[in-house]
């Protein structure tokens, strides 16, 4: 059985600001939109809240119009403010007075990039694959049935995505072959932190997969809190809480007698990081990238995005001892990622990856052959 994990960075629609080259602009817009939506949820808006909303709306250019190139202000019922010649006049006193939000606009992913995503999955040919940053189940189904087959791949019989708490459409999904049915699913999307906010922005569901021989393998796809907005204390604490909870889920599965468990996906931190300690150091899960049979595919380290150096390791396939001990082969596929410009590319990419926008993803696919 071959298992894989791949952060595809969306199939058909990608947040528009993330498709341009200015990382600082993307960071500012993403953070401003996120902070605004949190402020909107307050039951009462203080004068300080209103001042901050005014500043953030101006940063997004939404003080002058309801939409622009990168952001959109949706006013569904009631009204947050009026636009006047003198500026914004706030009329809502709290969340109960209106319904609305700010969302980041999306645009179609480059058609060549979509096909390169399919080529990566075709070449890996996993029986079970965790797909990170996918829009929804329908999108993943269409990708499997339409795009994967266009490049000579085989469609997947079972496709599942559980919608998470992140409004950007970057959820985690699972695809399995016809003879690897999904028997049970357990979502953790409603779990809260001590402060009452969602613990998982993207769900960390449990799937029971049955093999053709009738064995049970539990698969937990993950996408932890990103460092994109800055690796601050709040970001680290969120990843630590997510890692600790997934470690609890893993221990429960093992205590229930399940020896075959895989935790996989984009954990958004490095192997020695403190936020991932509960999962990587405090359980008996083992990282496939340290297995002696792991094939780096010519990369300088075990990294899974960027340049492929050790410091670029943020994607994982973590296996329980029973699975890790039986690994027959494992590796990484960087061929769909942009190898850089110049006469000496960082790795051998597909001939179709001629420009940055042709890249399947910034991430590489991980795979392992397990018993």
Task: Spell out what each predicted region is.
Residues 136-138, 167-171, 227-229, 268-274, ...:
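Active-site environment of divalent metal-dependent phosphoester hydrolases
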Residues 8, 134, 224, 266-267, ...:
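Active-site metal-binding loops of divalent metal-dependent hydrolases
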Residues 102-108, 125-131, 161, 194, ...:
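Second-shell loop/turn segments in exported
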Residues 212-215, 220-236:
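Active-site His/acidic residue clusters
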């Amino acid at each position: 059985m071959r298992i894989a994990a791949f952060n595809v960075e969306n199939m058909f629609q990608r947040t528009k600001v993330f498709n341009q080259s200015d990382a600082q602009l993307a960071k500012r817009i993403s953070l401003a939109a996120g902070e605004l939506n949190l402020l909107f949820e307050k039951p009462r808006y203080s004068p300080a809240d209103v001042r901050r909303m005014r500043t953030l709306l101006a940063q997004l250019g939404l003080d002058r119009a309801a939409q622009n190139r990168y952001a959109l202000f949706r006013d569904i019922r009631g009204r947050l403010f009026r636009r006047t010649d003198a500026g914004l006049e706030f009329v809502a006193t709290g969340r109960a007075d209106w319904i609305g939000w700010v969302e980041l606009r999306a645009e179609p992913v480059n058609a060549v990039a979509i096909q390169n995503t399919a080529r990566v999955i075709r070449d890996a040919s996993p029986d079970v694959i965790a797909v990170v940053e996918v829009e929804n189940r329908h999108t993943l189904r269409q990708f499997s049935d339409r795009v994967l087959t266009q490049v000579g791949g085989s469609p997947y019989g079972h496709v599942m995505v559980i919608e998470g708490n992140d409004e950007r459409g970057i959820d985690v999904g699972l695809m399995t072959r016809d003879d690897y049915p999904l028997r049970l699913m357990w979502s953790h999307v409603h779990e809260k932190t001590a402060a009452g906010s969602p613990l998982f922005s993207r769900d960390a569901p449990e799937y029971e997969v049955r093999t053709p021989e009738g064995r049970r393998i539990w698969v937990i796809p993950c996408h932890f809190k990103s460092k994109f907005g800055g690796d601050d204390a709040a970001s680290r604490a969120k990843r630590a809480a997510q890692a600790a909870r997934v470690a609890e889920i893993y221990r429960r599965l093992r205590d229930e007698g399940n020896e075959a468990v895989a935790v996989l996906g984009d954990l958004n931190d490095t192997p020695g990081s403190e936020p991932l300690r509960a999962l990587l150091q405090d359980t008996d899960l083992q990282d496939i990238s340290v297995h002696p049979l792991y094939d780096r595919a010519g990369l300088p380290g075990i990294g899974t995005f960027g340049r492929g150096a050790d410091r670029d390791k943020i994607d994982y396939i973590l296996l329980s001892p029973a699975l890790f001990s039986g690994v027959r082969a494992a590796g990484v596929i960087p061929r769909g990622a942009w190898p850089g410009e110049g006469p000496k590319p960082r790795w051998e990419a597909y001939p179709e990856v001629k420009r940055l926008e042709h890249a399947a993803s910034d991430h590489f696919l991980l795979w392992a052959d397990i018993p």
